[in-house]
Amino acid sequence: MKKTEKVKFIINTLEDLYPKVEVPLNHKDPYTLLIAVLLSAQSTDAGVNKITPKLFAIADNPYDMIKMSIDEIREIIRPVGLSPMKSKGIYGLSKILIEKHDGKVPKNLKDLEELPAVGHKTASVVISQAFGIPAFPVDTHIHRLMFRWGLSTGKSVKKTEEDAKRIFPKNLWNKLHIQIIYYGREFCPARGWNFKNDIITQKIGRKSVIKKFLI
């Protein structure tokens, strides 16, 4: 199957399975999305969604957030892990948003990536899902599936993102990256993978991946 045919099959299959998708992290505006995505690093969306209601009930904007101490933030977010780093990041970025951006979340990668504890993936999620700017954030699910589907080498997340942007239509990026995450969780996980249920990998998967499973 040609790569263009693979891409068309992936897009059509994901659209059939997930015609409507939402960001898995609960939020109400760009700031709360930014905080939620930051918290999700090396954690689960479900875990983040359990603690953000308590945090946002106290502070759902940078002005209220810096009224809290780093220790107070840390105590609330402790269950999601990496709380020392994340609490400092939340406090620090909130302060910078007030000082440099009038308390608003910037709409570009450069300014977002200059904020404490905000990496490229986090920034990409924010511009994509908060502002509708085309981006293709790559998480572990997308990185894994792009390799299994033979669409990227799997050498690095950066390479996977470059390949995804080159292969998939730009107007689909914002929805498609979430659809792939949904599919990865449901049909193509890193552990407990049931190849018989994975209709996309069965159809267009990398030969070495399929062969390894069948042996």
Q: Language-model segments: which ranges?
A:
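Catalytic cores of DNA base-excision repair glycosylases
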Residues: 2-215
